[in-house]
């Protein structure tokens, strides 16, 4: 298996990390700067050892079997997610049976800082060579833009609010064990990967762009599962075979999706006995007020009644107009969710961590 680790951080404008006072390294955020090009529309395993992953989406959950909630549950209404037009049909990206090949010809780098020890991510600047020609990679880098209307929504970068939320997970000792988790607008997938490492029973990753899922999210998921040697399992001690089995389970509990939120919503709700998410994680997804209706509807339809959303955002996004206060006002007017500010980060552009829960959970 030939894949390359690169332990230095490229000083490229399109993939530049800056250090905060606490040592956290973040990418310079164009989502917080005015840019005329910004969008105004939405959105290791042993060799020769294959893992057959089956869907976990129909697993039973006691939290979703109670009496009907006072707020109408519209999950069976095919019209409910049609408030805005869809630019990207949703699809599930099937996990490869043999994930050994996922990291072939992929350049990885380690995230800096002790709080991200042993976390490897795709070096996205290397994708320019892997995908020459006209595509979202070339368009993003050539236009120096992270938001291309209806084409690309920033999934190739790790945004600074993602690191804010990762830091909060540690400080607040957020519990993931036994939870069904959605990393919404996942990009690198670091939030979902952290949940998986924390013992989540199932983790779903969603991003607007399929290429981001295939070339960034999936490799990151595979790279952060404990890798074993290349032996085929014959004549191995029982302990080693058990570890391989555990790696397989880690991979199999992850599912990956691409497409616009409303389409993703409809796709997963087609599943029989769909079990809603206990926890939805999302970072820098409220930058455009035009998306608020669809995002709110997604939370309403996919979140367990006793679940919560953990959301990270800048106070305001210049150029597109969204931000925490405008989104909170939108949520309050809807009257479905309660919002609570968990933390305010004043370094650089002001940023917020927020929790959303149902006003009437039962």
Swiss-Prot record:
Q: Which regions are flagged for Basic and acidic residues bias?
A: 30-51, 73-82
Query: Where can the motif Nuclear localization signal be found?
Result: 237-243
**Signal peptide range in chain numbering:** none
Q: Give all Tele-methylhistidine modified positions.
A: 144
Entry EC no(s): 2.1.1.85
Give the sites modified to Phosphoserine: 62, 67
* Keywords for the protein's UniProt record, in alphabetical order: Cytoplasm, Methylation, Methyltransferase, Nucleus, Phosphoprotein, S-adenosyl-L-methionine, Transferase
Look up the domain of life of the source. Answer: Eukaryota
Where would you find this protein in the cell? Cytoplasm, Cytosol; Nucleus; Nucleus, Nucleolus
Gene Ontology biological process terms, A to Z: peptidyl-lysine monomethylation; regulation of ribosome biogenesis; regulation of rRNA processing; regulation of translation; regulation of translational elongation
Q: Which residues bind S-adenosyl-L-methionine?
A: 158-162, 185, 206-208, 259-261, 283
The main location is cytoplasm
User: One GO CC term of this entry?
Assistant: cytosol
Is Nucleus given among the entry's keywords?
yes
What family is this protein classified in?
A: Belongs to the methyltransferase superfamily. METTL18 family.
- Oligomeric state and partners? Interacts with GRWD1 and members of the heat shock protein 90 and 70 families; these proteins may possibly be methylation substrates for the enzyme.
Kindly provide the name given to this protein in its UniProt entry. Histidine protein methyltransferase 1 homolog
- Primary gene name: Mettl18
């Amino acid at each position: 298996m030939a894949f390359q680790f690169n332990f230095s951080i490229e000083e490229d404008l399109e993939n530049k990390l800056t250090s905060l006072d606490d040592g956290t390294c973040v990418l310079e955020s164009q989502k917080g700067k005015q840019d005329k090009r910004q969008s105004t529309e939405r959105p290791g395993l042993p060799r020769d050892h294959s893992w057959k992953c089956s869907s976990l989406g129909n697993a039973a959950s006691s939290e979703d079997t109670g009496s009907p909630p006072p707020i109408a549950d519209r999950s069976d209404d095919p019209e409910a997610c049609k408030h805005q037009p869809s630019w990207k049909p949703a699809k599930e990206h099937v996990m490869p049976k043999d994930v050994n090949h996922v990291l072939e010809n992929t350049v990885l780098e380690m995230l800096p800082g002790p709080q991200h020890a042993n976390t490897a991510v795709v070096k996205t600047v290397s994708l320019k060579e892997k995908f020459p020609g006209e595509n979202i990679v070339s368009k993003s880098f050539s236009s120096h833009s992270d938001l291309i209307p209806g084409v690309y929504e920033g999934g190739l970068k790790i945004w600074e609010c993602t690191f804010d939320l990762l830091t909060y997970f540690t400080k607040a000792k957020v519990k993931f064990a036994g939870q069904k988790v959605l990393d919404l607008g996942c990009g690198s997938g670091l939030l979902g990967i952290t949940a998986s490492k924390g013992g989540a029973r199932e983790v779903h990753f969603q991003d607007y762009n399929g290429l981001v899922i295939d070339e960034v999210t999936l490799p990151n998921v595979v790279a952060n599962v404990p890798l074993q040697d290349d032996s085929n399992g014959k004549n191995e001690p029982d302990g080693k075979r058990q570890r391989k089995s555990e790696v397989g389970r880690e991979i199999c509990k992850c599912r990956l999706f691409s497409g616009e939120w409303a389409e993703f919503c409809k796709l997963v709700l087609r599943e029989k006995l769909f079990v809603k998410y206990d926890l939805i994680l999302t970072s820098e997804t409220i930058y455009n007020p035009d998306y608020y209706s669809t995002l709110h509807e997604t939370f309403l339809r996919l979140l367990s009644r006793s679940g919560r959303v953990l959301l990270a955002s800048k106070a305001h996004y210049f150029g597109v107009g969204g931000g925490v206060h405008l989104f909170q006002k939108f949520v309050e007017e809807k009257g479905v969710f309660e919002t609570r500010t968990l933390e305010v980060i004043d370094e650089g552009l002001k940023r917020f961590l927020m929790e959303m829960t149902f006003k009437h959970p039962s």
